[in-house]
Structures are given as structure tokens and as C-alpha cells.
């Protein structure tokens, strides 16, 4: 079996903090080229953002076509002096491989590559269809020059995908406890309340926006947006900052702002959600409070891969290796699956995510072996 642990180590040793690649894609490209994949390195640009390198590799020309997706970029390591082992060492200690990206998600990518190479080795270097890899270096930051553009680039070339496995760390506690089959949408905005600046000693000459924005925050937060759906938990609106831009104690501010984020389910579209919140705001304002919402652009719409043959196949592979039947979940934050879902059904399954983004991020060596076996089981069933 191809050593997924070695690939994980080699990837961790590339300090690929977004937007730097630091050689990570080269590690993967060399392995895939040697196995017969046709590879493409594609760089995308956008004014005001860093250029990002991406990798697309495919073997086979027919269907069915399964693609493994992922990202080699990582978040900064934080205070490196606080790490038990160097953050980009990829050292193994007490059954764990340490390093930024071990869990999120260089370990998952390494396992998918190792599984694909083993499958090809056992089947005459050709799948009964096609296997590809969609790997970006722009997931942990703005996600502008990464998967979303790589998918469009592939589509413009005539590439089509039947199914996708995204190797994000989906498991909560142990390997095999969770597959992500969808994600809630994400919409952010700023609530702005207009008052009138003045001296605190003469409140009748001013209009204080602070009490008003407080009332509106309560009004928008208290009433549920929905009761959830068959596959999703209830949507939630959370205010995250309140600011008046005023450092003086004797001045009534003229304007107040409160930022918020909504994680919403399939009871809403982006448009209907905005309309609902605007309607509630207008009701709470009445004829007295002057307020409006500045909505931020969002590319994080809700999606769901409905349970069916593909999810059944993945569940069977997981259950065979781990003895556990995974939960089909839609919890958690956003991922690049939101982009992939526009092109094909996508599931997320990877390592246990308990230490991702933390000091001493680490993956169990045993879990890496387990995930490789599961991915191999998915390929065996997919091309059966």
C-alpha cells in the first residue's frame, strides 16, 4: 500500500500558509504524474488578491468520473514556541503526526492520493472510468482564486464530474462517525441605525442610536427564523459586533452599527432570507427608528446531497473498515463543497477534526491508515 503517512509528512513540511504554495502542489503533481495522471497547474488572479496556484489531475477519459477535492493551504501556526514539535516538521510522536495541516486537510489529501495509486496499481493502471483530483491553495482565506475558478476552468475544457469526495475533517470524535452531506448557507450583514449626534447634557437636541440598535438586535435575534428541516438544524442569526465609533463620554453618537452572520438552512434562499429579515426590521422600526441593513456579497448558499446510491456506497465503505455507521450530517461551517455542489453531488469525509487550526494540530497515524482504506473501499465500490 502506498504510504499515506509519508505523503502527509511531505505536505506538512511545505509551509503553505495561504496564499503561499511552498511546494505542496508539486509534491502531489509528481506522485500523480508518475502514476499516469494528466496534470495541469493553473494560476488564477483577481485584482486586490494574491495569485493562487491550483492543480487538476485526471486519469481516464470515460465515466463514471469520481473526483477527490481538497486544499493544501493552511492557516498560520500561531505562536510556534507553544508547539510541542515544530509546526511544519511533520514529526511523529506517540502515534500522532504533528504539524499545521495534518488534519485540515493535508492528511485527507494524502490518503485519497494513496488510495487512488493503490487502486490503479491493482487494476492495470487504468480505472473503469475516471479518477481526478481538484486541489487548490485558496480555501483558508478569501476562496476567490481557488476551487470556484478551478471548477469553471475545468467545465470550460469540457470536463464533467459525476461525484466528488471532499476530504475535509468531517469526523467529530472517532473515524467513521460522520459524513457531511450538506452545509448551511452563510450570509453576513451590518445593521445601521441613524441617530443625531449631540451633547449628553442636551439629549432633547440629539437622537441616541444606542438604545434603538439594542432594541433592534433583540427583535431580530429573539424570533426564530425557522424550525429546521428534515436534514438541517434551525437557522440562526448571531450579532458579532456593536460599534458607535465614539470614544467620548460626553457625546451622543450619531450612528450605530452592528455586524451579524446568519447560518441558514434549506427553508430559505439567499433572496428570501434577506427579505424575511428586512420585513422583521421594518416591523421593529415602526415609524420612529431609522435603520437599514448593508448586506455583504455571499457565495455560500445552502446545499444538500440527497441520500442515495453514492452516500450508501460511502457508508458501506466506512462501515466495513470501522464497524460504525456514520451519521449523515449538515452541521458545521462552510467549505469548498458549496462550490462543488453546483457541478455534481459531493460528500465530505476525512479525518477527525478535533485539533484543526489549533496549536499542536495532529492526526492519528492509525486514522490515516483507516482513511486510506476507506477511500480505497469507495473506489472499489464505485468502479465495481
UniProtKB/Swiss-Prot annotation:
<feature type="binding site">
    <location>
        <position position="71"/>
    </location>
    <ligand>
        <name>Zn(2+) 1</name>
    </ligand>
</feature>
<dbReference type="Pfam" id="PF01546">
    <property type="entry name" value="Peptidase_M20"/>
</dbReference>
<dbReference type="GO" id="GO:0009014">
    <property type="term" value="F:succinyl-diaminopimelate desuccinylase activity"/>
</dbReference>
<feature type="binding site">
    <location>
        <position position="140"/>
    </location>
    <ligand>
        <name>Zn(2+) 2</name>
    </ligand>
</feature>
<feature type="active site" description="Proton acceptor">
    <location>
        <position position="139"/>
    </location>
</feature>
<dbReference type="InterPro" id="IPR050072">
    <property type="entry name" value="Peptidase_M20A"/>
</dbReference>
<dbReference type="InterPro" id="IPR005941">
    <property type="entry name" value="DapE_proteobac"/>
</dbReference>
<dbReference type="InterPro" id="IPR036264">
    <property type="entry name" value="Bact_exopeptidase_dim_dom"/>
</dbReference>
<feature type="binding site">
    <location>
        <position position="104"/>
    </location>
    <ligand>
        <name>Zn(2+) 2</name>
    </ligand>
</feature>
<dbReference type="GO" id="GO:0008777">
    <property type="term" value="F:acetylornithine deacetylase activity"/>
</dbReference>
<dbReference type="InterPro" id="IPR011650">
    <property type="entry name" value="Peptidase_M20_dimer"/>
</dbReference>
<comment type="similarity">
    <text>Belongs to the peptidase M20A family. DapE subfamily.</text>
</comment>
<protein>
    <recommendedName>
        <fullName>Succinyl-diaminopimelate desuccinylase</fullName>
        <ecNumber>3.5.1.18</ecNumber>
    </recommendedName>
</protein>
<dbReference type="GO" id="GO:0050897">
    <property type="term" value="F:cobalt ion binding"/>
</dbReference>
<dbReference type="GO" id="GO:0006526">
    <property type="term" value="P:L-arginine biosynthetic process"/>
</dbReference>
<keyword id="KW-0862">Zinc</keyword>
<feature type="binding site">
    <location>
        <position position="104"/>
    </location>
    <ligand>
        <name>Zn(2+) 1</name>
    </ligand>
</feature>
<comment type="pathway">
    <text>Amino-acid biosynthesis; L-lysine biosynthesis via DAP pathway; LL-2,6-diaminopimelate from (S)-tetrahydrodipicolinate (succinylase route): step 3/3.</text>
</comment>
<keyword id="KW-0220">Diaminopimelate biosynthesis</keyword>
<keyword id="KW-0457">Lysine biosynthesis</keyword>
<feature type="binding site">
    <location>
        <position position="357"/>
    </location>
    <ligand>
        <name>Zn(2+) 2</name>
    </ligand>
</feature>
<feature type="binding site">
    <location>
        <position position="168"/>
    </location>
    <ligand>
        <name>Zn(2+) 1</name>
    </ligand>
</feature>
<feature type="active site">
    <location>
        <position position="73"/>
    </location>
</feature>
<keyword id="KW-0479">Metal-binding</keyword>
<comment type="function">
    <text>Catalyzes the hydrolysis of N-succinyl-L,L-diaminopimelic acid (SDAP), forming succinate and LL-2,6-diaminopimelate (DAP), an intermediate involved in the bacterial biosynthesis of lysine and meso-diaminopimelic acid, an essential component of bacterial cell walls.</text>
</comment>
<keyword id="KW-0028">Amino-acid biosynthesis</keyword>
<keyword id="KW-0170">Cobalt</keyword>
<dbReference type="GO" id="GO:0008270">
    <property type="term" value="F:zinc ion binding"/>
</dbReference>
<dbReference type="Pfam" id="PF07687">
    <property type="entry name" value="M20_dimer"/>
</dbReference>
<dbReference type="GO" id="GO:0009089">
    <property type="term" value="P:lysine biosynthetic process via diaminopimelate"/>
</dbReference>
<keyword id="KW-0378">Hydrolase</keyword>
<comment type="subunit">
    <text>Homodimer.</text>
</comment>
<dbReference type="InterPro" id="IPR002933">
    <property type="entry name" value="Peptidase_M20"/>
</dbReference>
<dbReference type="GO" id="GO:0019877">
    <property type="term" value="P:diaminopimelate biosynthetic process"/>
</dbReference>
Amino acid at each position: 500500500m502506498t504510504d499515506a503517512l509519508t505523503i502527509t509528512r511531505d505536505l506538512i513540511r511545505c509551509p503553505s500558509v495561504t496564499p503561499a504554495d511552498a511546494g505542496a502542489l508539486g509534491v502531489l503533481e509528481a506522485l500523480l504524474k508518475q502514476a499516469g495522471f494528466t496534470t495541469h497547474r493553473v494560476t488564477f488572479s483577481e485584482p486586490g488578491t494574491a495569485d493562487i496556484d491550483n492543480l487538476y489531475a485526471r486519469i481516464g477519459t470515460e465515466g463514471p468520473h469520481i473526483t477527490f477535492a481538497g486544499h493544501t493551504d493552511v492557516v498560520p501556526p500561531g505562536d510556534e514556541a507553544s508547539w510541542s514539535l515544530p509546526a511544519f516538521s511533520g514529526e511523529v510522536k506517540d502515534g500522532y503526526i504533528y504539524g499545521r495541516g495534518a488534519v485540515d486537510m493535508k492528511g485527507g489529501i494524502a490518503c485519497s492520493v494513496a488510495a487512488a495509486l493503490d487502486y490503479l496499481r491493482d487494476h492495470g493502471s487504468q480505472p473503469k472510468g475516471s479518477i481526478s483530483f481538484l486541489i487548490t491553495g485558496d480555501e483558508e482565506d478569501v476562496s476567490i482564486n481557488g476551487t470556484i475558478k478551478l471548477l469553471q476552468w475545468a467545465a470550460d475544457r469540457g470536463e464533467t464530474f459525476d461525484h466528488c469526495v471532499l476530504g475535509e475533517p468531517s469526523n467529530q470524535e472517532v473515524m467513521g462517525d460522520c459524513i457531511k452531506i450538506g452545509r448551511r448557507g452563510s450570509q453576513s450583514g451590518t445593521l445601521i441605525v441613524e441617530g443625531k449626534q449631540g451633547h449628553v447634557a442636551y439629549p432633547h437636541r440629539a437622537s441616541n442610536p444606542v438604545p434603538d440598535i439594542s432594541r433592534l438586535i433583540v427583535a431580530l435575534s429573539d424570533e426564530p427564523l425557522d424550525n429546521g428541516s428534515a436534514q438541517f438544524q434551525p437557522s440562526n442569526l448571531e450579532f458579532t459586533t456593536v460599534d458607535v465609533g465614539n470614544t467620548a463620554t460626553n457625546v451622543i453618537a450619531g450612528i450605530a452599527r452592528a455586524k451579524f452572520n446568519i447560518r441558514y438552512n434549506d427553508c430559505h434562499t439567499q433572496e428570501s432570507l434577506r427579505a424575511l429579515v428586512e420585513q422583521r426590521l421594518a416591523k421593529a422600526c415602526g415609524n420612529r427608528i431609522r435603520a437599514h441593513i448593508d448586506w455583504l456579497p455571499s457565495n455560500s448558499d445552502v446545499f444538500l446531497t440527497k441520500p442515495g446510491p453514492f452516500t450508501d456506497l460511502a457508508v458501506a465503505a466506512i462501515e466495513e473498515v470501522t464497524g460504525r455507521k456514520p451519521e449523515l450530517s449538515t452541521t458545521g461551517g462552510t467549505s469548498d463543497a458549496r462550490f462543488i455542489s453546483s457541478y455534481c453531488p459531493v460528500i465530505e469525509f476525512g479525518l477527525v477534526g478535533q485539533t484543526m487550526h489549533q496549536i499542536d494540530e495532529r492526526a492519528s497515524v492509525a486514522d490515516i491508515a483507516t482513511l486510506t482504506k476507506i477511500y480505497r473501499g469507495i473506489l472499489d465500490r464505485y468502479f465495481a
